[in-house]
């Protein structure tokens, strides 16, 4: 049986940079409040490379290994949201990934 793949978009950056030098918590809190106020489903997920475990998607674990430092990934099915984050944050990497699971 062939798995269905879904396209997700992501940003990746140093964990230290996103948690210590950028207002990531504030940005995500504002976006979450916006989603709730507009009755939209929250469609982003945060993966911390230092906290991945056996239950984490294999594709995410493989992607995290491409970075040589502790990394935060923010993944969404909403390309506009990732573009918005890219404009708000500095020193980040963006791309897309095909996942055989639905987040």
Curated annotation (Swiss-Prot):
Entry keyword Zinc-finger: no
Pfam families in the record: Ycf54
Protein localization: Plastid, Chloroplast
Keywords noted in UniProt: Chloroplast, Plastid
Encoding gene (name): ycf54
Gene3D superfamilies: Uncharacterised protein family Ycf54 (3.30.70.1860)
GO cellular component, one term: chloroplast
Name recorded for this polypeptide: Uncharacterized protein ycf54
Record-stated family: Belongs to the ycf54 family.
Chief location category: plastid
């Amino acid at each position: 049986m062939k798995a269905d793949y879904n396209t997700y978009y992501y940003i990746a950056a140093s964990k230290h940079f996103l948690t210590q030098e950028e207002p990531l918590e504030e940005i995500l809190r504002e976006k979450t409040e916006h989603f709730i106020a507009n009755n939209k489903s929250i469609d982003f997920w945060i993966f911390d490379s230092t906290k991945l475990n056996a239950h984490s998607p294999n594709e995410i674990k493989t992607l995290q290994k491409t970075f040589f430092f502790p990394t935060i990934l923010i993944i969404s099915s909403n390309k506009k949201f990732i573009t918005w984050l890219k404009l708000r944050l500095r020193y980040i990497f963006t791309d897309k990934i095909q996942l055989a699971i639905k987040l």
